[in-house]
Amino acid sequence: MLTLDQMVGQEKIKAYFQRARAVSHLSHAYILSGEEGMGKKTLAQAIALLLVCEEGGDSPCLCCHACRQVLAHSHPDVIELVKEKSISVDDIRSKINDTVDIRPFSAPVKIYIIDHAERMNVQAQNALLKTIEEPPSYVIIFLLTTNREVFLDTIQSRCIHLRMQPLPVEVVAQKLKESYPITDMQAREYATYARGNLGRAKNLLEDEAKRIRYQKNVKILKDIGNFTLEQMVKVLAEMKEEDSNFSEFLQFIRDWYRDVLIVLVGADVRKLIFSTEMKTMKEKAEQYSLTKVNQILEAVDLAQDRIQANVKAELAMQMLLMEMKVGEDNG
């Protein structure tokens, strides 16, 4: 668990909480939103650590009984609600509503952290709304989410919304270099691919299945011109088990052809995502016309639209891969 000072980035949000705490003007409910891997839970826990520390300094001491309890996830006044699937009304009632009127055991505040709060169904949101509307003065609720739009308007209007921002690619690359045995170029590629999301970049390096899928995707796009229909069917069937609506692969294809486009038009190659594939990108740029690359990018959007319209995903993807193959055949 990190302190606010140890967290990388999110300077505006960290400064906000430091100021709000200094003048005793913390809100009773916050929505922390951002992509998976942006550090929403880490941030909420760091704030909890700061607020319950017995020393009351600008940074938690990490030594007092309260700090040690938070670090061990056992502080009675820092309650986390984590559910793998949906969050039901019973979950909200038992974890929050039934305990909210019990004063803090030892801390000056009572903090509730709801992870993946977008998993609350409407009934659960309505149950939580009652607490958010009239909370005890000592209560602070954090709703952590990848999509705040799923919340009822009445909940959104009663919470302060703070959005987690991506880190500069250079910062993520440096952090990866410090933690993993990779080259500068690899670090930059993963950081760029993750779009400044440190958690996502780390997950790609630590999760063997994701790393293998990344490498397989690169190979598919490098070799697509030589694929037969049978090979396309095979790779799509394998991929569907990991990514049922192919959303990650579709974004991967966009990123790949974006890089081809950068080389094709002579733009700054430092902006490439797949920087370790520079040689391949130059070869692809020689094979494609600008019109053809744009047609493929439009075909990617069309494939996604078809899948969202309930066209069989494998069929939509086969049509896309055929378009990409024809592009290599004809330029």
For each predicted feature, which ranges?
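Charged, glycine-rich active-site and insertion segments that engage polyanionic ligands
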Residues: 1-49, 66-69, 137-138, 147-252, ...
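Structural signal for conserved beta-strand scaffold positions within catalytic alpha/beta enzyme cores
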Residues: 80-82, 143, 161-163
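Catalytic acidic motif of RecA-like/P-loop NTPases
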Residues: 115-121, 126-133, 149
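Clamp-loader machinery-focused feature within the broader ASCE/P-loop NTPase space
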Residues: 1-123
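Conserved catalytic/switch belt of AAA+ P-loop NTPases
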Residues: 101, 126-143
